[in-house]
Amino acid sequence: MNLSWLPSMLQTTDPLFPIGSYAHSYGMEELCADGEISNREDLQTFLHTVVALNLQEFELPYLRFAYEAAKRQDYDLICDLDEEIGASKPSKELRQASLSQGQQRLRLISKLRPSPRFEELAKLKREKRIVPQHLIIFATENVDLNTPLPAALAAWAYQAMAAPCAASLKLIRIGQEGAQTALTNALERLEPIIEHSLGIDREFAGAFLPYLDIASQRHEKAYSRLFIS
């Protein structure tokens, strides 16, 4: 069994990997301020509904499209996907969160593990053909590592579920054990989410989440805040 991809994938999905993800709550801070999320049960509901739906219907399908495009080195398609991902984020904060993490990930992995794929993405960025979106860089990186697609999907989904749990420690009275309990319950439901996402075609990919979009837009104007988004 060839697991040469695994150590590097673990490194770049670890919270220690400095792309700034710790500074974002992705709209959750405003939901906590409004009282929508105030305890572990509320957090679990948020993970099982909003986060799960966004993963299943939008992020995981687009991660698969980007992974397959990077594998074929179809950079025209990568440009199209990058634009579509950005257009799907009506909130300025969410767009900027994806942009900043995508740029930082590309900059860092290009230094740590130089690759023609990363050079091409940097060229597309200079030409302003891509932003690049974080998801695009993550997909291309895992193609370059020879990470199997299911593992890449699971790693992205884990990050999406873990981020609100990490933010919750600063936003509500939950504690480390409560946050880990919520995360464990969410992770137990990941497999069917990933399986379902594999059957979604590009023309049907997308999630309508005004609840989160409105919270993120309100967060932009908040009087005080802990997180960038």
Describe the function of each predicted region.
Residues V143, A155-S229:
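C-terminal auxiliary extensions adjacent to catalytic cores
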Residues L60, F65, R72-V143:
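Internal, conserved structured core segments that host functional sites
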Residues W5, M9-Q73:
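Glycine/small-residue-rich interface belts in oligomeric ring/scaffold proteins
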Residues G35, L47, V51-L55, Y67-D74, ...:
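Structural signal for hydrophobic packing residues in well-ordered secondary-structure cores
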Residues M9-P18, L47-L53, A87-L94, A122-K128, ...:
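A short glycine/serine-rich beta->alpha loop
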